[in-house]
Amino acid sequence: MKIWNFGIIGAGLIADFHAKAIGSINNARLVGICGTNHEKALTLSKKHNCRKYDNHIEMLQSDEIDIVTIATPSGAHMEPAIEAAKYGKHVICEKPIEITLERIDKMIKAHQEAGTSLGGIFNFR
């Protein structure tokens, strides 16, 4: 069975929930976290026994990462999602996926062109 290696972009409260969820999946492994708040990212990386990346580009450049979870604040999902597509990474994005349809369309287009998957979180559903 393939083990999917995850990275989390964002180090706030929701990132900890995502890290716990990833840890509960048999064929998933959290390998890294990054965030603009480096102290929070370091704390989460220690808590979940994974690498702390300095930024999302460094994380996306890693061949070890298959999927990234975007757990940044609303309105800050498009850029890392498009960058992830450029690096061939699948994306699971916290809701709302973005704040305008135009921004969502750009994300969808980037992933269609890259042949990667883009999905949204629908917890408790």
What are these regions (language model features)?
Residues 1-48:
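N-terminal Rossmann-like dinucleotide-binding module
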Residues 11, 70, 96, 121-122:
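Glycine- and other small-residue-rich loops at beta-strand/loop junctions that grip anionic moieties
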Residues 13, 39-40, 75-79, 99, ...:
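Short alpha-helical
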Residues 20, 102-105, 124:
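Surface-exposed alpha-helical interface segments used for non-catalytic interactions
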Residues 26-27, 87, 112-116:
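Short helix-capping segments at alpha-helix termini
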Residues 32, 66-67, 117-119:
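Short, Asp-centered acidic motifs that coordinate Mg2+ and/or phosphate
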Residues 48-110:
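Beta-loop-alpha module in the N-terminal Rossmann-like domain of NAD(P)-dependent dehydrogenases
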Residues 106-123:
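Rossmann-fold dehydrogenase core element
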